[in-house]
Amino acid sequence: MHKFKLLFYILVLYAFIFSNNAFSASKKCTNIKKICNVLDKVVGIKTPMMIASGTIINENLIITNRHVVEDHKQFIIKFNDGKIKKAFPLAHNFPADLALLTLNKEKDIPNELIYSKKIKGFINVVAFDQGRNSNRIYKKGKIISFSDITKYPQGRIHTTANSLPGNSGGVAVDEDGNFVGILASGDGNINEIIPIVLINHILK
């Protein structure tokens, strides 16, 4: 049984790294240019348990969900141009389903993430698509609720923007390509996004 699990893991890892769809950057994006540019800000993440998504904060730092990272010690990261690197978790004690990954084991953490306080128009989820084995912009949707973070620190944005299993850790953006938040969960109809402002609580 152990050998079967090991073989399955190797096959999944091989497909994740060497798929013909690896170089998604070569595919023409037909969306708004500002949203198309976000494709290079998203990565695929391979853990011992799943394939998920992550969002690049700077050249060394990636944010994803805590439920993706769990207690694993390292991860395989696939960039939009097909490059593969290892990443390692950085500890934090802020109570949110967010996790930081570093590409060089150094705590090269910015003091603050600059973000827009206004959300323009509809939003899209940009994440790693397991089926295509490449980054993808999903069908746009509207925000249906947005809690006051000052009163409800764990409040989430609820949206009709489409996503699929394995998109956890991907980023939601508005029509200007501004980060709105990090995808956390959903049921295929209504999805939950962790507001981007909460990332700054982790960076502190």
Indicate where each model-derived feature is located.
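Conserved hydrophobic positions within beta-strands
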Residues: 56, 87-89, 143, 179
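Boundary at the C-terminal end of the N-terminal hydrophobic targeting segment
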Residues: 19-24
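Conserved active-site neighborhood of the chymotrypsin/trypsin-like protease fold
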Residues: 42, 50-51, 58-137, 153-154, ...
